[in-house]
């Protein structure tokens, strides 16, 4: 996959019914880390309000993700489609190694201002833009960034600079 230009690996632990912190999950994290890949982990794949009652897949628990982030400081994680980070160790700058970025696709910049709160507690350099495309229209995500009460330099970090650096694009 490296020869084909891949820069990351998307993991779906809850959908594929494995735990990231069990020996096989950690072996997968270690193998991807050895290849220099970013590990992309969606906290939520599908909104429970829209899916069939026959599908019972919980959201990725932040406690399990935080444990793996702490256990594998050389790995690089991209946590996407999540919310509520501000209340746990993933939302505090000195709680875990700086080996993860959080995508802002499910957060808001006005009502609870989770994006603004994370800028203050974690730093703009740990957040990346996310839109949920192709399943969501990007307009709302772009608007959230536009109305965010933050310096323009922080908005640029979130919009593209952090992701470009994380993926080693330039």
PLM features per residue range, with description:
Residues 130-139:
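Short glycine/proline-rich, acidic loop/turn segments that cap or connect secondary-structure elements
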Residues 12-19:
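The substrate-binding groove and active-site-proximal loops of carbohydrate-active enzymes
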Residues 17, 108-110, 135-136:
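Short gly/pro/ser/thr-enriched loop/turn and capping motifs at secondary-structure boundaries
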């Amino acid at each position: 996959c490296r020869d084909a230009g891949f820069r990351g690996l998307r993991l779906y632990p809850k959908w594929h019914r494995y735990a990231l912190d069990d020996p096989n999950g950690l072996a997968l994290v270690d193998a991807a880390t050895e290849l220099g890949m970013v590990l992309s982990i969606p906290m939520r794949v599908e909104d429970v309000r829209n899916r069939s009652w026959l599908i019972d897949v919980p959201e990725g628990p932040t406690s399990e993700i935080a444990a793996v982030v702490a256990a594998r400081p050389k790995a690089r994680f991209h946590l996407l489609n999540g919310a509520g980070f501000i209340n746990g160790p993933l939302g505090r700058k000195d709680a875990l190694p700086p080996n993860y970025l959080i995508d802002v696709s499910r957060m808001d910049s006005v009502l609870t201002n989770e994006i603004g709160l994370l800028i203050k507690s974690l730093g703009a350099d740990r957040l990346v833009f996310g839109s949920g495309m192709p399943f969501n229209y990007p307009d709302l995500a772009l608007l959230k960034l536009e109305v965010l009460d933050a310096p323009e330099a922080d908005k640029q970090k979130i919009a593209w600079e952090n992701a470009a650096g994380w993926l080693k694009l330039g």
